[in-house]
Amino acid sequence: MKIWFKLWTDTRLTASETIEITDDDTRTHKVFRALEEACLAFDLGKPIWLDANVNEFKRRSKARFTKDNFVEEIEFDYMEMQVLEED
């Protein structure tokens, strides 16, 4: 599974990271692990999954995390994650 993480500020892409998870774990575990790796790469705390994020991810394999999803203050408008390749 390959997931693309992007940080957006004022409609501009300010940072990007692609994480690839190749083990035989479940899809959910792969998504959570990729999110954790991306947050480490961006030096961020992990966002909180709200119901809207879960529903959007189920429908479109894509989710946006805004300031409402983070405990600490963030310096960007939102982080977007998108599944590029499934196993």
Residue ranges of predicted features:
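Short, flexible N-terminal segments of the mature chain
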Residues: 13-41
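Amphipathic beta-strand/beta-sheet edge segments enriched in Tyr/Trp
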Residues: 3-5
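Hydrophobic side chains in beta-strands
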Residues: 7, 19-21, 83
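Solvent-exposed strand-loop boundary residues in beta-sheet-rich modules
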Residues: 9-11
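Acidic, low-complexity intrinsically disordered segments
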Residues: 34-87
